[in-house]
Amino acid sequence: MKRKLIYIFSCWLSFLILFVACDDMEDKPFTSGIIGDPTETGTAELYVLCEGLFNQNNSSLARFSFGNQQIVRDYFKAVNRRGLGDTANDMAIYGSKIYVIVNISSTVEVIDFRTGSSLKQIQMLAENGSSRQPRYIAFHKEKAYVCSYDGTVARIDTTSLSIEAITSVGRNPDGICVQNEKLYISNSGGLDYSSGLGVDNTVSVVDIATFKESSKLTVGPNPGKIVAGPDETVYVATRGEDVEAGDYNFVKIDCRTNKVTQSNEKVQNFAIDGEIAYLYNYNYNTQTSSIKMFNLKTEETIRENFITDGTVIKTPYGININPYSNNVYITEARDYTTYGDLLCFNQQGQLMFRLNNIGLNPNTIAFSDKASQSDIDDNDDDKENPLAFANKVWEYRPAPGQFINTTTSAYKEGFTYDDILEEATRRIQQKSLLTLGGFGGYIVLGFPQS
């Protein structure tokens, strides 16, 4: 007979530990399930960057190996015995290294692809020691270019891993790409949203040879995602003065003439595969999403609904194309506080496979045709405390009338108390946030103990 520890926590920071014997509480370890048949053309591994929660210092990097069908959810931590940091925004594989941009920690984490070990944590700091808050990365001829919220772009040598130079662009850059020996940087001005200054509306063009800004192009309010397209073009999504208002636009830049053309396509994020763009939009009012296929050459919609098999993605959070198979990968963030999923679709919009519970707020996927040599598995990241996590909620009594963040509550309309306990247990098992409502709320948790 197993013995279980039941911990009672209260908002007064007092607690009581009770020991009880029971037979009906089975251990339910958190697992990242695989649905479907994860086979890919020319692809050995994929990596998923998970942003985590703001100011929670819980960003993670997951690895999936197609050869042995194995997921390692917190791959970086399992190898390096430390976390990535706070709010990871972007990732790319370049040469023999993986580069991860960690915004709030203000670092660029450089990882050896072969072993998964950290090679260097580049501190992105201004001369006065303040954080630059890096956002996105692009590469060109053995150099990495990182745009940061402080209005700068850094040039990093990919051999020495040192910052060679810094150049100034617009306000709060929120995207970067390379086209025709130039850098294109979207200047969001997002941090000025609530000030009298308002958001920015420009894309900076930086000549790579001189590493100086040569021009600014007006594209629309609050530009974000920016990607190089076919035929010497660049595409950018503008998000409007208020992101939640849904005033999005898909904008084309002709890099030969600097001509800017706006469309009526409502786009929050997108990926480009040759002449085809996959555009997704999220409506904050209805909490629904849409994903379409768009022909960049003819500027016509190929398919209004990219997904054709009825698969529903509630909260798309990232989209990338596998360059080896041209399959489309979309991440699902759920409610932003529970572990999200990674879904792979073929070009016909049919779900090929799904990796469940890959991490908190998965935002970027990178692919490799070579396999790493680290044989660490998904259990190695928690070896130090295998019994440290609760796996059962016995009682859940939030403070009455004090709910503010309902997305972290187990209460949902129409739920019975048994339903509430089941939902609370699910959140605890997924290591997600669960509110106690306010002063006076408490929860009774069960822990496995031999």
Label every PLM stretch briefly.
Residues W12, D23-D375:
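Predominantly soluble domains enriched in secretory-pathway, periplasmic, or organellar proteins
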Residues L18-A21:
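C-terminal motif of bacterial Sec signal peptides marking the signal peptidase cleavage site
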